[in-house]
Protein backbone atom coordinates (compact mmCIF):
# COMPACT_ATOMS: atom_id res chain seq x y z
CA UNK A 1 0.00 0.00 0.00
CA UNK A 2 1.48 3.32 -1.06
CA UNK A 3 0.42 6.78 0.00
CA UNK A 4 -1.53 8.42 -2.83
CA UNK A 5 -1.77 12.17 -2.33
CA UNK A 6 -4.35 14.38 -4.02
CA UNK A 7 -3.95 14.79 -7.78
CA UNK A 8 -3.08 18.48 -7.47
CA UNK A 9 0.03 17.77 -5.38
CA UNK A 10 1.32 14.92 -7.55
CA UNK A 11 4.55 15.53 -9.43
CA UNK A 12 4.99 13.53 -12.60
CA UNK A 13 8.32 12.37 -13.96
CA UNK A 14 9.52 10.29 -16.89
CA UNK A 15 11.50 7.02 -16.77
CA UNK A 16 14.82 7.64 -18.56
CA UNK A 17 16.78 4.44 -17.84
CA UNK A 18 16.07 0.93 -16.55
CA UNK A 19 18.93 -1.36 -15.47
CA UNK A 20 17.55 -4.46 -13.73
CA UNK A 21 15.71 -3.35 -10.58
CA UNK A 22 17.19 0.18 -10.73
CA UNK A 23 15.51 3.00 -12.65
CA UNK A 24 16.43 6.62 -13.32
CA UNK A 25 13.51 9.05 -13.44
CA UNK A 26 13.57 12.68 -14.62
CA UNK A 27 11.37 15.27 -12.91
CA UNK A 28 10.62 18.95 -13.65
CA UNK A 29 13.17 21.44 -12.26
CA UNK A 30 12.61 22.22 -8.58
CA UNK A 31 10.20 19.32 -8.11
CA UNK A 32 12.53 16.42 -7.31
CA UNK A 33 11.08 13.86 -4.87
CA UNK A 34 12.76 13.41 -1.49
CA UNK A 35 15.03 10.43 -0.84
CA UNK A 36 12.96 7.43 0.41
CA UNK A 37 9.78 8.71 -1.29
CA UNK A 38 7.75 6.11 -3.16
CA UNK A 39 7.32 6.49 -6.92
CA UNK A 40 4.36 4.83 -8.63
CA UNK A 41 4.39 3.67 -12.25
CA UNK A 42 1.07 2.52 -13.73
CA UNK A 43 1.09 1.84 -17.45
CA UNK A 44 0.76 -0.83 -20.12
CA UNK A 45 3.82 -2.65 -21.44
CA UNK A 46 4.44 -3.10 -25.19
CA UNK A 47 2.45 -6.38 -25.06
CA UNK A 48 -0.58 -4.51 -23.68
CA UNK A 49 -0.34 -5.94 -20.15
CA UNK A 50 -0.87 -3.74 -17.09
CA UNK A 51 2.18 -2.66 -15.08
CA UNK A 52 1.77 -1.43 -11.50
CA UNK A 53 5.16 -0.87 -9.94
CA UNK A 54 6.41 0.94 -6.85
CA UNK A 55 10.00 2.12 -6.52
CA UNK A 56 11.82 3.88 -3.69
CA UNK A 57 14.04 6.92 -4.33
CA UNK A 58 17.63 6.20 -3.24
CA UNK A 59 19.83 8.84 -4.88
CA UNK A 60 19.62 12.33 -6.39
CA UNK A 61 21.77 12.26 -9.53
CA UNK A 62 21.68 15.87 -10.75
CA UNK A 63 20.21 17.01 -14.10
CA UNK A 64 16.75 16.75 -12.45
CA UNK A 65 17.08 12.96 -12.17
CA UNK A 66 16.66 10.54 -9.28
CA UNK A 67 17.67 6.90 -9.03
CA UNK A 68 15.10 4.53 -7.52
CA UNK A 69 15.02 0.84 -6.61
CA UNK A 70 11.98 -1.19 -7.69
CA UNK A 71 10.01 -3.23 -5.14
CA UNK A 72 8.87 -5.73 -7.79
CA UNK A 73 10.07 -7.00 -11.18
CA UNK A 74 10.76 -4.37 -13.86
CA UNK A 75 9.82 -6.64 -16.80
CA UNK A 76 7.99 -4.67 -19.48
CA UNK A 77 9.13 -1.28 -18.19
CA UNK A 78 10.30 1.04 -21.00
CA UNK A 79 11.81 4.49 -21.20
CA UNK A 80 9.31 7.29 -21.48
CA UNK A 81 6.78 5.80 -19.06
CA UNK A 82 5.24 8.18 -16.53
CA UNK A 83 6.30 7.92 -12.86
CA UNK A 84 4.33 9.71 -10.14
CA UNK A 85 5.92 10.97 -6.91
CA UNK A 86 3.50 9.94 -4.14
CA UNK A 87 5.08 12.54 -1.85
CA UNK A 88 5.59 10.06 1.00
CA UNK A 89 7.48 6.85 1.83
CA UNK A 90 5.95 3.40 1.30
CA UNK A 91 3.12 2.93 3.82
CA UNK A 92 1.65 -0.32 5.14
CA UNK A 93 -1.64 -1.14 6.91
CA UNK A 94 -1.45 -1.37 10.71
CA UNK A 95 -3.70 -2.43 13.58
CA UNK A 96 -5.89 -5.39 14.52
CA UNK A 97 -7.00 -5.95 10.91
CA UNK A 98 -3.48 -7.15 10.00
CA UNK A 99 -3.70 -10.19 12.33
CA UNK A 100 -4.00 -13.52 10.53
CA UNK A 101 -3.10 -11.94 7.18
CA UNK A 102 -0.03 -12.21 4.90
CA UNK A 103 1.41 -9.07 3.31
CA UNK A 104 4.14 -8.21 0.85
CA UNK A 105 6.65 -5.37 1.32
CA UNK A 106 4.07 -2.78 0.14
CA UNK A 107 1.46 -3.95 2.65
CA UNK A 108 -0.67 -5.56 -0.06
CA UNK A 109 -2.40 -8.78 1.12
CA UNK A 110 -1.13 -11.85 -0.76
CA UNK A 111 -3.24 -14.54 0.96
CA UNK A 112 -6.28 -14.31 -1.37
CA UNK A 113 -8.49 -13.34 1.59
CA UNK A 114 -9.67 -10.05 0.08
CA UNK A 115 -8.74 -6.47 1.02
CA UNK A 116 -7.61 -5.51 4.53
CA UNK A 117 -10.38 -4.00 6.60
CA UNK A 118 -8.54 -0.90 7.84
CA UNK A 119 -7.82 2.65 6.77
CA UNK A 120 -4.93 3.00 9.23
CA UNK A 121 -1.53 3.04 7.54
CA UNK A 122 1.97 4.03 8.66
CA UNK A 123 5.16 4.88 6.73
CA UNK A 124 7.90 2.23 6.93
CA UNK A 125 10.61 4.86 7.50
CA UNK A 126 10.58 6.66 10.84
CA UNK A 127 13.02 7.70 13.53
CA UNK A 128 13.85 5.42 16.46
CA UNK A 129 12.13 6.35 19.77
CA UNK A 130 13.74 9.23 21.69
CA UNK A 131 16.02 8.34 24.59
CA UNK A 132 13.58 10.01 27.01
CA UNK A 133 10.80 7.64 25.83
CA UNK A 134 12.79 4.44 26.42
CA UNK A 135 12.31 2.01 29.29
CA UNK A 136 15.86 1.75 30.62
CA UNK A 137 15.38 -0.65 33.54
CA UNK A 138 16.24 -4.18 32.34
CA UNK A 139 13.28 -6.49 32.80
CA UNK A 140 13.19 -10.24 32.13
CA UNK A 141 10.62 -11.35 29.56
CA UNK A 142 9.11 -14.61 30.88
CA UNK A 143 8.44 -17.10 28.07
CA UNK A 144 7.19 -20.06 30.15
CA UNK A 145 9.89 -22.22 28.52
CA UNK A 146 12.14 -23.56 31.29
CA UNK A 147 15.47 -23.78 29.46
CA UNK A 148 15.18 -20.21 28.11
CA UNK A 149 13.90 -18.57 31.30
CA UNK A 150 16.54 -20.22 33.49
CA UNK A 151 19.72 -20.26 31.39
CA UNK A 152 19.37 -17.60 28.66
CA UNK A 153 16.54 -15.26 29.73
CA UNK A 154 15.15 -12.79 27.21
CA UNK A 155 15.07 -9.07 27.91
CA UNK A 156 11.74 -7.30 27.46
CA UNK A 157 12.32 -5.07 24.44
CA UNK A 158 15.58 -6.89 23.73
CA UNK A 159 16.92 -8.73 20.72
CA UNK A 160 17.58 -12.45 20.59
CA UNK A 161 19.59 -14.33 17.97
CA UNK A 162 18.16 -17.76 17.11
CA UNK A 163 20.78 -20.14 15.73
CA UNK A 164 19.96 -23.58 14.40
CA UNK A 165 20.13 -25.78 11.33
CA UNK A 166 17.24 -27.37 9.48
CA UNK A 167 14.91 -29.71 11.36
CA UNK A 168 15.95 -28.94 14.95
CA UNK A 169 12.73 -27.19 15.94
CA UNK A 170 13.12 -23.46 15.13
CA UNK A 171 9.58 -23.15 13.75
CA UNK A 172 7.93 -24.97 16.65
CA UNK A 173 9.86 -22.83 19.16
CA UNK A 174 8.73 -19.68 17.31
CA UNK A 175 5.11 -20.91 17.32
CA UNK A 176 5.24 -21.64 21.06
CA UNK A 177 6.64 -18.18 21.82
CA UNK A 178 3.85 -16.59 19.73
CA UNK A 179 1.25 -18.70 21.57
CA UNK A 180 2.66 -17.92 25.04
CA UNK A 181 2.93 -14.15 24.53
CA UNK A 182 -0.70 -14.08 23.38
CA UNK A 183 -2.02 -16.15 26.30
CA UNK A 184 0.17 -14.97 29.19
CA UNK A 185 1.08 -11.40 28.20
CA UNK A 186 -1.97 -10.48 26.09
CA UNK A 187 0.46 -9.55 23.33
CA UNK A 188 0.59 -10.14 19.60
CA UNK A 189 3.34 -11.11 17.19
CA UNK A 190 4.55 -10.02 13.79
CA UNK A 191 6.56 -12.36 11.56
CA UNK A 192 8.89 -10.85 8.95
CA UNK A 193 10.06 -13.37 6.35
CA UNK A 194 13.13 -11.73 4.82
CA UNK A 195 14.68 -13.41 1.79
CA UNK A 196 13.87 -16.99 2.74
CA UNK A 197 12.20 -19.73 0.66
CA UNK A 198 8.58 -19.26 -0.46
CA UNK A 199 7.89 -22.91 0.43
CA UNK A 200 9.02 -22.28 4.02
CA UNK A 201 6.73 -19.26 4.27
CA UNK A 202 3.79 -21.31 3.00
CA UNK A 203 4.60 -24.20 5.37
CA UNK A 204 4.80 -21.77 8.30
CA UNK A 205 1.40 -20.27 7.40
CA UNK A 206 -0.19 -23.73 7.18
CA UNK A 207 1.39 -24.78 10.50
CA UNK A 208 0.16 -21.57 12.16
CA UNK A 209 -3.38 -22.42 11.00
CA UNK A 210 -3.03 -26.03 12.18
CA UNK A 211 -1.78 -25.07 15.64
CA UNK A 212 -4.38 -22.30 16.15
CA UNK A 213 -1.92 -19.37 16.07
CA UNK A 214 -3.92 -18.21 13.02
CA UNK A 215 -7.67 -18.80 13.29
CA UNK A 216 -8.80 -19.28 9.68
CA UNK A 217 -12.52 -19.18 10.64
CA UNK A 218 -12.25 -15.94 12.64
CA UNK A 219 -9.15 -13.93 11.76
CA UNK A 220 -9.77 -11.50 14.66
CA UNK A 221 -8.81 -14.35 17.02
CA UNK A 222 -5.42 -14.76 15.33
CA UNK A 223 -2.23 -13.89 17.21
CA UNK A 224 0.18 -13.03 14.40
CA UNK A 225 0.54 -10.87 11.28
CA UNK A 226 2.92 -12.06 8.55
CA UNK A 227 4.97 -9.98 6.13
CA UNK A 228 6.99 -11.73 3.41
CA UNK A 229 9.66 -10.66 0.93
CA UNK A 230 11.02 -13.95 -0.35
CA UNK A 231 14.14 -15.16 -2.13
CA UNK A 232 12.70 -14.76 -5.63
CA UNK A 233 11.84 -11.09 -5.13
CA UNK A 234 14.05 -8.14 -6.16
CA UNK A 235 16.63 -6.92 -3.63
CA UNK A 236 14.60 -3.75 -2.95
CA UNK A 237 11.70 -5.81 -1.57
CA UNK A 238 13.99 -8.01 0.53
CA UNK A 239 15.77 -4.94 1.90
CA UNK A 240 12.54 -3.21 3.00
CA UNK A 241 10.24 -6.04 4.11
CA UNK A 242 11.87 -6.12 7.57
CA UNK A 243 10.90 -2.46 7.99
CA UNK A 244 7.32 -3.21 6.85
CA UNK A 245 6.99 -5.91 9.54
CA UNK A 246 8.61 -3.63 12.15
CA UNK A 247 6.16 -0.81 11.31
CA UNK A 248 3.22 -3.15 12.00
CA UNK A 249 4.83 -4.15 15.32
CA UNK A 250 5.46 -0.50 16.29
CA UNK A 251 1.75 0.28 15.95
CA UNK A 252 0.83 -2.48 18.42
CA UNK A 253 3.49 -1.13 20.82
CA UNK A 254 2.85 2.62 20.52
CA UNK A 255 -0.90 2.82 19.82
CA UNK A 256 -2.29 -0.37 21.40
CA UNK A 257 0.35 -0.20 24.19
CA UNK A 258 1.01 -3.95 23.95
CA UNK A 259 4.04 -6.18 24.35
CA UNK A 260 4.91 -7.41 20.87
CA UNK A 261 7.10 -10.23 19.58
CA UNK A 262 8.81 -9.50 16.27
CA UNK A 263 10.32 -12.44 14.41
CA UNK A 264 12.80 -11.79 11.61
CA UNK A 265 13.81 -14.76 9.48
CA UNK A 266 16.52 -14.19 8.32
CA UNK A 267 18.44 -11.09 9.42
CA UNK A 268 21.40 -12.09 7.23
CA UNK A 269 19.20 -11.87 4.11
CA UNK A 270 18.35 -8.27 5.06
CA UNK A 271 22.07 -7.43 5.00
CA UNK A 272 22.56 -9.42 1.79
CA UNK A 273 19.77 -7.50 0.04
CA UNK A 274 21.30 -4.20 1.18
CA UNK A 275 24.60 -5.32 -0.31
CA UNK A 276 22.94 -6.08 -3.67
CA UNK A 277 21.19 -2.69 -3.74
CA UNK A 278 24.42 -0.92 -2.80
CA UNK A 279 26.23 -2.52 -5.75
CA UNK A 280 23.35 -1.67 -8.12
CA UNK A 281 23.58 1.97 -7.03
CA UNK A 282 27.28 1.97 -7.88
CA UNK A 283 28.66 2.35 -4.36
CA UNK A 284 32.18 1.15 -3.66
CA UNK A 285 32.03 -2.19 -1.77
CA UNK A 286 33.52 -2.45 1.71
CA UNK A 287 34.90 -5.46 3.68
CA UNK A 288 34.13 -8.86 2.06
CA UNK A 289 32.09 -7.09 -0.63
CA UNK A 290 29.41 -5.78 1.76
CA UNK A 291 27.92 -2.30 1.46
CA UNK A 292 29.93 0.57 3.02
CA UNK A 293 26.77 1.52 4.97
CA UNK A 294 26.47 -1.92 6.67
CA UNK A 295 26.64 -0.54 10.23
CA UNK A 296 23.98 2.13 9.69
CA UNK A 297 21.68 -0.18 7.68
CA UNK A 298 21.58 -2.72 10.53
CA UNK A 299 21.51 0.02 13.18
CA UNK A 300 18.49 1.81 11.66
CA UNK A 301 16.47 -1.41 11.86
CA UNK A 302 17.71 -2.56 15.28
CA UNK A 303 17.41 0.82 17.04
CA UNK A 304 13.66 0.88 16.38
CA UNK A 305 13.26 -2.50 18.13
CA UNK A 306 13.10 -1.49 21.79
CA UNK A 307 11.04 -1.02 24.98
CA UNK A 308 9.30 2.32 25.46
CA UNK A 309 7.31 3.54 28.47
CA UNK A 310 4.14 2.49 26.57
CA UNK A 311 5.01 -1.08 25.52
CA UNK A 312 7.78 -3.23 24.11
CA UNK A 313 8.97 -4.99 20.97
CA UNK A 314 11.00 -8.07 21.79
CA UNK A 315 12.69 -9.34 18.67
CA UNK A 316 13.77 -12.88 17.87
CA UNK A 317 16.00 -12.97 14.81
CA UNK A 318 17.13 -16.10 13.01
CA UNK A 319 20.78 -15.59 12.11
CA UNK A 320 22.36 -17.43 9.20
CA UNK A 321 26.14 -17.56 9.56
CA UNK A 322 27.77 -17.83 6.11
CA UNK A 323 30.24 -20.75 5.99
CA UNK A 324 29.97 -20.90 9.82
CA UNK A 325 32.31 -17.89 9.96
CA UNK A 326 31.29 -15.79 12.96
CA UNK A 327 33.79 -13.09 11.97
CA UNK A 328 31.95 -12.39 8.68
CA UNK A 329 30.88 -8.70 8.77
CA UNK A 330 27.14 -9.51 8.47
CA UNK A 331 26.76 -11.73 11.58
CA UNK A 332 29.48 -9.78 13.42
CA UNK A 333 27.52 -6.53 13.00
CA UNK A 334 24.30 -8.26 14.09
CA UNK A 335 25.91 -9.71 17.25
CA UNK A 336 26.70 -6.20 18.50
CA UNK A 337 22.93 -5.58 18.86
CA UNK A 338 21.88 -8.89 20.47
CA UNK A 339 21.03 -9.24 24.18
CA UNK A 340 20.78 -13.03 24.09
CA UNK A 341 21.48 -16.01 21.85
CA UNK A 342 19.39 -19.19 21.70
CA UNK A 343 21.33 -22.03 20.08
CA UNK A 344 19.46 -25.14 18.95
CA UNK A 345 21.57 -28.32 18.97
CA UNK A 346 21.00 -31.27 16.64
CA UNK A 347 22.51 -33.66 19.22
CA UNK A 348 19.74 -32.79 21.71
CA UNK A 349 17.02 -33.15 19.06
CA UNK A 350 18.45 -36.59 18.23
CA UNK A 351 18.07 -37.56 21.92
CA UNK A 352 14.42 -36.45 21.81
CA UNK A 353 15.02 -33.45 24.10
CA UNK A 354 12.60 -30.74 22.92
CA UNK A 355 13.00 -27.78 22.83
CA UNK A 356 16.53 -28.66 21.66
CA UNK A 357 18.08 -25.49 23.17
CA UNK A 358 21.77 -26.00 23.98
CA UNK A 359 22.10 -25.10 27.70
CA UNK A 360 25.87 -24.50 27.45
CA UNK A 361 26.03 -22.56 24.17
CA UNK A 362 23.02 -20.28 24.70
CA UNK A 363 23.86 -16.98 26.41
CA UNK A 364 22.16 -13.85 27.74
CA UNK A 365 23.33 -10.48 29.06
CA UNK A 366 20.40 -10.68 31.51
CA UNK A 367 21.95 -13.58 33.43
CA UNK A 368 23.63 -11.52 36.15
CA UNK A 369 22.73 -11.28 39.86
CA UNK A 370 21.89 -7.55 39.67
CA UNK A 371 19.14 -8.29 37.10
CA UNK A 372 17.73 -11.76 37.83
CA UNK A 373 18.63 -11.99 41.52
CA UNK A 374 21.12 -14.21 43.39
CA UNK A 375 18.96 -17.35 43.60
CA UNK A 376 18.23 -17.47 39.85
CA UNK A 377 21.86 -16.70 38.98
CA UNK A 378 23.34 -19.35 41.32
CA UNK A 379 20.84 -22.00 40.18
CA UNK A 380 21.57 -21.32 36.49
CA UNK A 381 25.34 -21.46 37.01
CA UNK A 382 25.07 -24.67 39.08
CA UNK A 383 22.96 -26.29 36.34
CA UNK A 384 25.52 -25.28 33.69
CA UNK A 385 28.52 -26.51 35.71
CA UNK A 386 26.77 -29.87 36.35
CA UNK A 387 26.05 -30.27 32.62
CA UNK A 388 29.60 -29.19 31.74
CA UNK A 389 31.06 -31.82 34.10
CA UNK A 390 28.77 -34.47 32.56
CA UNK A 391 30.02 -33.45 29.10
CA UNK A 392 33.65 -33.85 30.25
CA UNK A 393 32.92 -37.31 31.67
CA UNK A 394 31.18 -38.65 28.55
CA UNK A 395 34.41 -39.86 26.92
CA UNK A 396 35.36 -41.81 30.05
CA UNK A 397 31.84 -43.30 30.25
CA UNK A 398 31.99 -44.31 26.56
CA UNK A 399 35.33 -46.11 27.01
CA UNK A 400 35.21 -47.50 30.56
CA UNK A 401 31.55 -47.38 31.53
CA UNK A 402 29.76 -45.73 34.47
CA UNK A 403 31.14 -48.22 37.01
CA UNK A 404 34.67 -46.82 36.70
CA UNK A 405 33.59 -43.35 37.88
CA UNK A 406 33.98 -42.16 41.46
CA UNK A 407 30.89 -42.02 43.68
CA UNK A 408 30.80 -38.22 43.37
CA UNK A 409 31.04 -38.29 39.57
CA UNK A 410 28.33 -40.94 39.34
CA UNK A 411 26.04 -38.69 41.37
CA UNK A 412 26.89 -35.74 39.07
CA UNK A 413 26.07 -37.82 35.98
CA UNK A 414 22.78 -38.98 37.52
CA UNK A 415 21.72 -35.41 38.35
CA UNK A 416 22.94 -34.05 34.98
CA UNK A 417 20.78 -36.61 33.15
CA UNK A 418 17.77 -35.58 35.22
CA UNK A 419 18.52 -31.90 34.51
CA UNK A 420 18.83 -32.62 30.78
CA UNK A 421 15.47 -34.42 30.80
CA UNK A 422 13.85 -31.71 32.96
CA UNK A 423 14.96 -29.02 30.48
CA UNK A 424 12.51 -30.58 27.99
CA UNK A 425 8.82 -29.73 28.15
CA UNK A 426 5.65 -30.34 26.12
CA UNK A 427 4.52 -27.43 23.92
CA UNK A 428 0.96 -26.18 23.43
CA UNK A 429 1.43 -25.90 19.66
CA UNK A 430 2.68 -29.50 19.46
CA UNK A 431 -0.33 -30.99 21.31
CA UNK A 432 -1.92 -32.19 18.07
CA UNK A 433 1.25 -34.14 17.19
CA UNK A 434 2.30 -35.47 20.62
CA UNK A 435 -1.05 -35.95 22.33
CA UNK A 436 0.47 -34.32 25.45
CA UNK A 437 -1.00 -31.11 26.86
CA UNK A 438 1.37 -28.12 26.70
CA UNK A 439 2.89 -26.57 29.82
CA UNK A 440 3.68 -22.95 30.71
CA UNK A 441 6.11 -22.99 33.64
CA UNK A 442 6.45 -19.92 35.85
CA UNK A 443 10.02 -18.78 36.51
CA UNK A 444 9.82 -19.36 40.29
CA UNK A 445 8.65 -22.96 39.69
CA UNK A 446 11.53 -23.51 37.24
CA UNK A 447 14.14 -22.25 39.75
CA UNK A 448 12.62 -24.26 42.62
CA UNK A 449 12.56 -27.44 40.50
CA UNK A 450 16.20 -27.26 39.45
CA UNK A 451 17.27 -26.41 43.01
CA UNK A 452 15.61 -29.60 44.24
CA UNK A 453 17.47 -31.69 41.63
CA UNK A 454 20.82 -30.05 42.50
CA UNK A 455 20.34 -30.44 46.26
CA UNK A 456 19.75 -34.19 45.92
CA UNK A 457 16.14 -34.16 47.16
CA UNK A 458 15.02 -36.03 44.05
CA UNK A 459 17.92 -38.51 43.74
CA UNK A 460 15.59 -41.44 44.42
CA UNK A 461 13.20 -40.60 41.54
CA UNK A 462 13.65 -42.37 38.18
CA UNK A 463 15.24 -40.39 35.34
CA UNK A 464 12.23 -40.97 33.05
CA UNK A 465 9.94 -39.05 35.43
CA UNK A 466 11.72 -35.79 34.49
CA UNK A 467 11.13 -36.15 30.73
CA UNK A 468 8.59 -33.88 28.96
CA UNK A 469 6.88 -32.47 32.05
CA UNK A 470 6.17 -28.97 33.38
CA UNK A 471 7.01 -28.28 37.04
CA UNK A 472 8.43 -30.54 39.76
CA UNK A 473 4.96 -31.59 41.05
CA UNK A 474 4.36 -33.28 37.70
CA UNK A 475 7.72 -35.07 38.05
CA UNK A 476 6.62 -36.51 41.40
CA UNK A 477 3.22 -37.54 40.00
CA UNK A 478 4.89 -39.19 36.99
CA UNK A 479 7.34 -41.01 39.30
CA UNK A 480 4.41 -42.38 41.34
CA UNK A 481 2.74 -43.53 38.13
CA UNK A 482 5.93 -45.28 36.92
CA UNK A 483 6.28 -46.94 40.35
CA UNK A 484 2.68 -48.19 40.34
CA UNK A 485 3.07 -49.64 36.83
CA UNK A 486 6.06 -51.79 37.80
UniProtKB/Swiss-Prot annotation:
Catalytic class of the enzyme: translocase
PROSITE patterns per the UniProt record, alphabetical: ATPASE_ALPHA_BETA
Keyword Cell cycle assigned: no
Cellular component, GO annotation: plasma membrane-derived thylakoid membrane; proton-transporting ATP synthase complex
Residue ranges of the TM segments: none
Superkingdom of the organism of origin: Bacteria
Catalytic activity: ATP + H2O + 4 H(+)(in) = ADP + phosphate + 5 H(+)(out)
Binding sites annotated in the UniProt record for ATP: 164-171
InterPro entries: AAA+_ATPase, ATP-synt_VA_C, ATP_synth_F1_bsu, ATPase_a/bsu_AS, ATPase_alpha/beta_chains, ATPase_F1/V1/A1_a/bsu_N, ATPase_F1/V1/A1_a/bsu_N_sf, ATPase_F1/V1/A1_a/bsu_nucl-bd
EC annotation from Swiss-Prot or TrEMBL: 7.1.2.2
PANTHER family assigned to the protein according to its UniProt record, in alphabetical order: ATP SYNTHASE (PTHR15184), ATP SYNTHASE SUBUNIT BETA, MITOCHONDRIAL (PTHR15184:SF71)
Protein name (record): ATP synthase subunit beta
UniProt lineage: Bacteria, Bacillati, Cyanobacteriota, Cyanophyceae, Synechococcales
Gene name of the record: atpD
Amino acid sequence: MVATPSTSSQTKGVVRQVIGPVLDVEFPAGKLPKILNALRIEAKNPAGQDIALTAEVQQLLGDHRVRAVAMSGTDGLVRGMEAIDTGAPISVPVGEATLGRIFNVLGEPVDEQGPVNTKDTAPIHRAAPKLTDLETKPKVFETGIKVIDLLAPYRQGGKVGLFGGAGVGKTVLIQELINNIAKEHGGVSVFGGVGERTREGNDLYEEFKESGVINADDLTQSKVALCFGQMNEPPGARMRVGLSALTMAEHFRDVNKQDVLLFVDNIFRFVQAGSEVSALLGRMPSAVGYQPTLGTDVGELQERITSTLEGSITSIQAVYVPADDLTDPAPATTFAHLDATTVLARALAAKGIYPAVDPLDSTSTMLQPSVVGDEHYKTARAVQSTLQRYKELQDIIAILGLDELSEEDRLTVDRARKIEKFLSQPFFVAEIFTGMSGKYVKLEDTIAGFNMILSGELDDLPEQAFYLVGNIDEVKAKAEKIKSEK
